[in-house]
C-alpha cells in the first residue's frame, strides 16, 4: 500500500466536530445544479428546430432539403461529441469537459443568431450538436462521481428531468418569440453552466485517478461537509484507483476483454433498447402521429410535453428506494402496452373500423408510451451507465456507449417515416417486440445498483 493510501486511512474528520450532526451536502446540490444546466442546454438544442422550422425556412429561403440537413447536423455533431467526450473528460477532467461543451454550444448559438445564410446556420447547428453530445456523457458521469450512494440515483435522474424540461420550454417559448431570440435564450443555460463551474469542485474520483491526492481530499471534504468523516470513502476510492492503475491503459479493444465485457454489454444493451424501442421516432414525429390519427396536434403536444416532465420528476425521489432494475422492468412493460395500443389504433384506421375510437386509442397509446419511458427507460440507462464502468475504462467505454445511443437516435428518427409509410400499425408492433426483448434483457443481464458505492458496483459487475 502506498504512503498516500496509508495517509487517507487516518480519520479525516474534524475532532472538534466528532459526534455532531452531519452537514447537509449543499455543495453536492450546487454541483448537481451546475451540471444539469448542461442538461437543460441539451434539451434546448434538441427542442429548437420544431418551433423554429417555418420561420427559418421563410426568412432564409431554405428548401426542405436544406432544412433537413440543418436538423440532421445536430445528431451528427452529437455523435462526434459523444465519441470524443470520454477522452476529453479523462484528459482535462469532468469540469473541463463541461466547459468545452458549454463553449461549443455558445459558439453554435451565436452562429445561428447571426446567420445570414445556410453555411453559418449549419455550422452553428453542428457546434451545438457537438456540445449536446458531450453533455450527454459527462453530466451523468460527473453527478454519479460526486453524489453519496444513498441518493446518487435521484441526483443522476435530474439529468433526464432537465433535458425534458429544456425541450418543453423551447417548444413553448418558440411559439412566442422569433427563431433568433429563441437561439439567444439557448445561450443562457450554457453560460450558467460555464460560469457555475468556477464555484464547484472537480470530481474527487478523477482527481484521485490523475494522482492529485491533496486536491482529491479537499474536493471530497467540500462535497461531504466539514463534519463528515470521509476516511472510509476516501480509502475505498484510493484503494480501487491503485488496483486499476496496475492495469495497462485501456484501449478500444480492451472493452471486449472478459473482465469488462459484462459492463460493456449492460451499458450498450440498455442504450440500444432505449433508442430502438422507438422513442426518437415517436418524439420527433408526435405531431404527425396525432395528425394521422385525427387528434388535435397542439393539444396532443402540450399533453405530451407536460406528462414527460411530470413523470420524470416524480420518478426521481423513488429511484434510490425502488431500485434501477424494477423501474426498468415497469417502464419496458409500459412501453410494450403503449405500442400495442397505438398499433391497434392504426390497424383500425387502415381497415376503416371504429372511427371514433381511433384518435382516442392513438392518444392513450402515445401517452402510456411516453409516461412509461419517462418512468424508467428515459433516465435509468444513463444512471446505470454512469455507475458500472471502472474509472480506467470509463472514458473509452462511456464515450462509446453514448455514441451507440446517438447512432440509435439517428437511425430510429431516420427510418420512422419510411416504416410508417410501409405500415403504421406494423411500425408500432416492431417497437413493441423490441421493448419486449428489453424486458428479457433487464431480467437476465442488468444488476441492481442501488445503495452501493461505485467501487462496490464495479467489483460485482467486473469481478
Swiss-Prot record:
UniProt organism field: Arabidopsis thaliana (Mouse-ear cress)
Transmembrane segments: 26-46, 69-89, 103-123, 126-146, 157-177, 181-201, 264-284, 299-319, 327-347, 357-377, 396-416, 426-446
Gene3D superfamilies: MFS general substrate transporter like domains (1.20.1250.20)
GO MF annotations, alphabetized: sugar transmembrane transporter activity
Superkingdom to which the source organism belongs: Eukaryota
Gene Ontology CC: cytosol; plant-type vacuole; plant-type vacuole membrane
Pfam families according to UniProt: Sugar_tr
InterPro entries, A to Z: MFS_dom (IPR020846), MFS_ERD6/Tret1-like (IPR044775), MFS_sugar_transport-like (IPR005828), MFS_trans_sf (IPR036259), MFS_Trehalose_Transporter (IPR050549), Sugar/inositol_transpt (IPR003663), Sugar_transporter_CS (IPR005829)
Lineage of source species: Eukaryota, Viridiplantae, Streptophyta, Embryophyta, Tracheophyta
PANTHER family: PTHR48021, SUGAR TRANSPORTER ERD6-LIKE 7
Name of the protein in question: Sugar transporter ERD6-like 7
Keyword Transmembrane helix in annotation: yes
Record function comment: Sugar transporter.
Family in the record: Belongs to the major facilitator superfamily. Sugar transporter (TC 2.A.1.1) family.
Cell compartments where the protein resides: Membrane
Alphabetical UniProt keywords: Membrane, Sugar transport, Transmembrane, Transmembrane helix, Transport
SUPFAM superfamilies assigned: MFS general substrate transporter
GO BP field: zinc ion transport
Keyword Transmembrane helix among record annotations: yes
Membrane topology designation: Multi-pass membrane protein
Main location: membrane
Amino acid at each position: 500500500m502506498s504512503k498516500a493510501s496509508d495517509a487517507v486511512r487516518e480519520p479525516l474528520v474534524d475532532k472538534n466536530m466528532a459526534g455532531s450532526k452531519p452537514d447537509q451536502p449543499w455543495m453536492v446540490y450546487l454541483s448537481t445544479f451546475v451540471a444539469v444546466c448542461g442538461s437543460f442546454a441539451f434539451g434546448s438544442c434538441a427542442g429548437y428546430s420544431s418551433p423554429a422550422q417555418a420561420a427559418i425556412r421563410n426568412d432564409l429561403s431554405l428548401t426542405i432539403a436544406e432544412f433537413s440537413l440543418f436538423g440532421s447536423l445536430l445528431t451528427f455533431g452529437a455523435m462526434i461529441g459523444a465519441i470524443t467526450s470520454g477522452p476529453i473528460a479523462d484528459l482535462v477532467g469532468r469540469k473541463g469537459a463541461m466547459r468545452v461543451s458549454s463553449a461549443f454550444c455558445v459558439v453554435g448559438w451565436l452562429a445561428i443568431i447571426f446567420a445570414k445564410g445556410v453555411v453559418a446556420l449549419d455550422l452553428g447547428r453542428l457546434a451545438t450538436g457537438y456540445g449536446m453530445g458531450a453533455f450527454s456523457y459527462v453530466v451523468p458521469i460527473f453527478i454519479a462521481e460526486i453524489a453519496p450512494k444513498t441518493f446518487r440515483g435521484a441526483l443522476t435522474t435530474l439529468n433526464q428531468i432537465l433535458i425534458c424540461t429544456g425541450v418543453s420550454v423551447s417548444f413553448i417559448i418558440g411559439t412566442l418569440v422569433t427563431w433568433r431570440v429563441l437561439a439567444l435564450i439557448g445561450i443562457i443555460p450554457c453560460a450558467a453552466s460555464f460560469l457555475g463551474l468556477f464555484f464547484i469542485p472537480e470530481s474527487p474520483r478523477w482527481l484521485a485517478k490523475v494522482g492529485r491526492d491533496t486536491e482529491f481530499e479537499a474536493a471530497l471534504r467540500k462535497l461531504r461537509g466539514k463534519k463528515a468523516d470521509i476516511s472510509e470513502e476516501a480509502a475505498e476510492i484510493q484503494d480501487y484507483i491503485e488496483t486499476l492503475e496496475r492495469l495497462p491503459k485501456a484501449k478500444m479493444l480492451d472493452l471486449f476483454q472478459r473482465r469488462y465485457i459484462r459492463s460493456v454489454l449492460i451499458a450498450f444493451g440498455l442504450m440500444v433498447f432505449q433508442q430502438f424501442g422507438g422513442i426518437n421516432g415517436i418524439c420527433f414525429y408526435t405531431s404527425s402521429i396525432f395528425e394521422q390519427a385525427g387528434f388535435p396536434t397542439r393539444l396532443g403536444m402540450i399533453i405530451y410535453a407536460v406528462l414527460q416532465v411530470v413523470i420524470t420528476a416524480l420518478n426521481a425521489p423513488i429511484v434510490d428506494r425502488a431500485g434501477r432494475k424494477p423501474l426498468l422492468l415497469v417502464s419496458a412493460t409500459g412501453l410494450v402496452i403503449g405500442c400495442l395500443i397505438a398499433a391497434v389504433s392504426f390497424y383500425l384506421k387502415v381497415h376503416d373500423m371504429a372511427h371514433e375510437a381511433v384518435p382516442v386509442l392513438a392518444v392513450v397509446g402515445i401517452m402510456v408510451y411516453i409516461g412509461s419511458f419517462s418512468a424508467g427507460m428515459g433516465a435509468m440507462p444513463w444512471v446505470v451507465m454512469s455507475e458500472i464502468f471502472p474509472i480506467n475504462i470509463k472514458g473509452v467505454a462511456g464515450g462509446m456507449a453514448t455514441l451507440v445511443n446517438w447512432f440509435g437516435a439517428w437511425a430510429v428518427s431516420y427510418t420512422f417515416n419510411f416504416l410508417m409509410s410501409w405500415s403504421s400499425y406494423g411500425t408500432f408492433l416492431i417497437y413493441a417486440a423490441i421493448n419486449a426483448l428489453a424486458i428479457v434483457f433487464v431480467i437476465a443481464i442488468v444488476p441492481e445498483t442501488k445503495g452501493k458505492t461505485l467501487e462496490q458496483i464495479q467489483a460485482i459487475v467486473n469481478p
